[in-house]
Amino acid sequence: MFRRITLLILAVALTAALAPLVTAEQQSVTAARATADKSWQGGRFDEIDTLAQAFPKDETIAVYHALSIAARGDYARAESILKPFVAANPAGDAALETGLLQLGVGRRTEGRQTLTLVLTADVRNPSARDFLRAARASRALHRIDDAQSYFRDAIALAPTDPRINTEWGELFVEKYANAEAAKSFQEALKADADYGPALLGMARALADENPPQAVMFAQSVLKLNPNDFGAHLLLAELAIYQDKKADAKESIERVLQVNPRHLEALSLRAALAYVEGRTDEYKKSVAEALKIHPTYGEIHRIVGMITAHYYRFDEAVEHTRMAIALDRENFRAIADLGKQLMRIGDERNARRNLETAFRIDKWDVMTFNLLELLDHLEPFDTINEGEMVIRLAPDESPVMKEYVPQLAREAMAALTKRWEFTPKGPILIEMFPSHDDFAVRTLGLPGMLGALGACFGRVVTIDSPRARDPGTFNWGETLWHELAHVITLQLSGNRLPRWLSEGTSVYEERRARAEWGRDMDIPFARSLERGQVLKIRDLNSGFSSSTTISYAYYQASLLVEHIVETHGQRQLRALVEAYADGSDTEAAIKKALGINIDELQASFDAALDKRYATLRRALKVPEGLAPGLPLEKIKAIADANPESFAAQMTLGEALAESNPDAAIAAFEKAAQLIPNVPGEDSPHAGIAAVALKKGDKARAARALEELTKVTHTDVESARQLAALVDATKEPARARTVLQRVVSVDPFDAESSAALGRLALKAGDTAEAIRAFRVAVASKPLDKATAHADLAEALLQAGQKDEARKQVMEALMIAPTFTRAQDLLLKISGGSR
């Protein structure tokens, strides 16, 4: 009994003596792991080297050490560091990172075996960390359903863990589910606002929709970790998209200075070299990447992706095919090929590749969207118009086929003549009644809220009039704009910078119709007054921000107009063509215009100052003018500032109720100062409103006429004007107004019918037939009359058989319809 008590006392004593030693060691290892994690998150690789020497037997620290060694390009040594830990624990973190390393250098069979062992291990009572490891392994093996399941299990155990939320978010980004990705990253940042991987994830999730904010997030990552390769390369990619190639090169080289064998960095360097025509450097980067990873088709996919951004879609297709030839399991390349083929109009082969990609990866949102879109396109009506193929939604085709082919013919005839260039066809034009379908057709994802059309060189996609609320845009203006892109993109070999491409298209809008392409004149003048106009060298960057893009479009069009007015149309053509041989903007300007970019900047600045001097003076707001002033004070300010638009408008608004005549006089002064103000802020809108209140319909009509000239999308004002104009006394004027209405809203059956009747009276049977066909197709309330109208126009044009068909349609609806009966007798040569 004593001996037993003595042994028990000794055991307790030994335990008491050893406990502090074990706890201290555990605490030391735990602290070292935390330090290693902080060092890794901060990109301080040398600190991790030191920790690894101090704790050579700890798997977690060994993993950080291997990651830091791999980050410096020594992939073989990184794997050798992990090897003993993998042997001891084939299902641990070291095994996971080994498998990822093996996949990363092209040893696919070994990598899959290693990761499969990670997944097949029998783990009792798995922790959140175990589920995360399984999720990452499943993702690498493209077992996305399993990965999603493991992520859910991990989150259930550790809902606020920033690493789990971030890793899950990265999976969503990979599959283009950016909204879901952002939710995961936001959860991570709630737990740790400075968690670099989550900040980088937010940057990636925002890169498509909000590039400036994405840049801010990426830059915040680099403040925490100057060696975050992902942040550097995202900034490089965004810089490429803004045509800031020098910035992109700097970001890429920052990565390659630390890791000269970084495959994605080599890929972006190759892509940049390719689009700049530096063929030897492109080949060198490709060779370096393939030496590391012999089947790294991703480098060709990335080159194709960047090349496509520069609108060189045929070349993008070639590069993406090279990616697949090198790695037939690269499902992203297969999906990309489908997307690129759609951009060159090869929808049959696009579908084949997209279906292949979708069989491999059913979680890819973009692939799913594009396949669904192709299903939507199947019932579209196809109209062959010379070298153009026009596709219209079946429920819109009966109306839009009367307008789209005619305008497309007019545009291509005018543009090919002016530019002395016939583009390669066929030119595919697709019009979408759903804006989201248009966005998916263009980028693969819904959104693109500000875009109305897109051009890929031989493919044009646009919103139909029904894709947005009537009066918010003009589909004809958009179509003309995009067809101008067809000319300039092909003439330049798809190498045009965006400022010149968009600027030329907006300028061509103004050339086509006096009222098109002028919406930004007043906002641009205000921007000029604030000194916020971009320099020519920076003009491309204006297209990457939602706050500056509208200004960039308009400024670019003014620059193109200045080039034509100063140097001539042939020199503008020469400038566009100069890019075909790979010239950059400065070289192209020198080659085509015979001046350097600074000289062009100086002459453009002078032209803007001259053009906007009067407008800028008129836009200045007098001191003391503010809302709520008494009428006498407003009068005094307006009298003292007769050249102030704001003063005259304020006076007109103040007098509108008490003295309509004086209000109209004030609005007229404002209109003389700035005649082209669009919308409800226009003095013409003020005049129309006051004139209608006082019963002066003639004055209201004149004001609305001026308003609709400068606000060509204002269909409601045009309808109001149509109601005021007496068609019996002024048929030509009424006809012009109705033409404006149907140009914006072709589905207005009543306006189309009224236009048809006026055209028929004027002897223009072609316009009458078209207008009546549209009225019939627009499902009017009085269908019988619509058919009879069309029959009458067809009969007048000598098309008796067609006229008879329409009369019979009318009589089927209303058998006792006298007018239709009379028309039938007339067609048959009889009489009552």
Predicted region positions:
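Helix-start (N-cap) detector for alpha-helical repeat units in TPR-like alpha-solenoids
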Residues: 29, 59-60, 92-93, 125-128, ...
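Structural marker of alpha-solenoid helical repeat scaffolds
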Residues: 54-55, 87-88, 121-123, 157, ...
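Juxtacatalytic substrate-recognition/specificity segment
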Residues: 113, 156, 183, 190, ...
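Beta/coil-rich, acidic/histidine-enriched accessory regions frequently appended to metallopeptidases
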Residues: 27-28, 37, 234, 268, ...
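N-terminal leader/linker segments that initiate helical-solenoid repeat arrays
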Residues: 18-80, 88-89, 93, 113, ...
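Structural signature of tandem alpha-helical TPR/SEL1-like repeats
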Residues: 43, 72-80, 106-114, 141-153, ...
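Canonical tetratricopeptide repeat
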Residues: 64, 97, 131-133, 167, ...
